[in-house]
């Protein structure tokens, strides 16, 4: 708000955001909400690119708007902290990158009976790509993968179109970018993010049908990326199960297929909701019984019961406290 009030311009690169991309830093550096906090600031442009070509397009546009056009906007761009291969840019994708979403990898199966659309942003886009392969190879589901570079841009565009249409009833209605991208699609829609579920929910009203939202609601934890993503239910296997569940809900496949996938992937359907697992010492008064049980089970498995970095007994004197 201070930067907006001062009419600041510029680009801020966030190297540590994302709930699951920075290993071993627990609550303090596992940010799952900064993109949500960007929503109320009108002059802040917030992007979560997955690949170098997306980042280049966003920065180039940011320099044009702030330095050339002298527009009073500033940028928050999260690049997370995970190394992975950088692909080449799909032809004609730059407009979608700047407006918030584009189709990164089509399924390649135009006549498939079972269709799905997977949406990822930042490092979680790689989980969507892995889920695309699993769905195609094991379940004959043709899934297109979409990159969402900015939930805020999509939300602001959608609400702006809604406002115009409400106040200009006799003029041609405007169509939000989300709806333009998806107007000729069918199937089910699954969105996965390294941030809270409120982000994908914020644009769901402009989808052809209600999408399934996967996110990282809850406290940050100290573990490997793969274990964190399994715990927060945003890894490729959870994306596959969410897709199969949506197909079963509309009657396209039987529910036994979903149950079989849950068992095959080693997903515990009785695991506690991640947002209820506090991560404190067993027996803490502020933990529910289910959350304590989930923490103990996960610690025994070495998987998802990850203690936060500060989950340790502090000296009685108050000296030697963690200084992180």
Place the predicted regions along the sequence by residue:
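Extended active-site and interfacial segments that coordinate phosphate-rich ligands
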Residues: 36
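Thiamine diphosphate
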Residues: 9-10, 14-16, 20-31, 39, ...
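Long, structured ligand/cofactor-binding scaffold of large enzymes
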Residues: 1-4
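Ferredoxin-type iron-sulfur electron-transfer modules in oxidoreductases and energy-metabolism complexes
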Residues: 51
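Compositionally biased, low-complexity flexible segments
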Residues: 287-324
């Amino acid at each position: 708000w201070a930067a907006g009030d001062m009419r600041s311009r510029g680009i801020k690169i966030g190297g540590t955001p994302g709930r699951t991309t920075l290993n071993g830093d627990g609550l303090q550096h596992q940010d799952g909400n900064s993109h949500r906090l960007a929503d109320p600031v009108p002059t802040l442009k917030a992007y979560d690119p997955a690949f170098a070509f997306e980042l280049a397009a966003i920065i180039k546009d940011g320099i044009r708007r702030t330095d050339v056009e002298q527009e009073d906007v500033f940028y928050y761009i999260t690049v997370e902290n995970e190394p992975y291969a950088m692909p080449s840019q799909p032809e004609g994708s730059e407009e979608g990158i700047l407006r918030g979403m584009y189709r990164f990898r089509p399924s390649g199966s135009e006549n498939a009976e079972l269709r799905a659309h997977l949406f990822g942003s930042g490092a979680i886009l790689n989980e969507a790509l892995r889920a695309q392969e699993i769905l195609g190879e094991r379940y004959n589901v043709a899934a297109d993968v979409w990159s969402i570079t900015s939930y805020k841009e999509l939300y602001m565009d959608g609400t702006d179109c809604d406002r115009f249409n409400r106040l200009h009833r006799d003029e041609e209605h405007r169509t939000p970018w989300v709806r333009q991208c998806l107007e000729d699609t069918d199937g089910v829609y699954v969105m996965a993010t390294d941030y809270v579920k409120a982000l994908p929910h914020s644009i769901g009203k402009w989808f052809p049908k209600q999408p399934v939202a996967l996110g990282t609601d809850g406290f940050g934890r100290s573990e490997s990326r793969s274990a964190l993503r399994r715990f927060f239910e945003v890894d490729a296997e959870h994306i596959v199960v969410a897709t199969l569940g949506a197909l079963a809900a509309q009657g396209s496949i039987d529910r036994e297929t979903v149950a079989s996938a849950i068992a095959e992937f080693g997903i515990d359907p009785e695991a506690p909701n991640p947002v209820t697992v506090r991560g404190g010492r067993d027996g803490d008064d502020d933990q529910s019984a289910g959350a304590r049980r989930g923490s103990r089970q996960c610690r025994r498995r070495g998987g998802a019961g990850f203690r936060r970095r500060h989950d340790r007994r502090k000296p009685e004197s108050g000296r030697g406290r963690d200084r992180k």
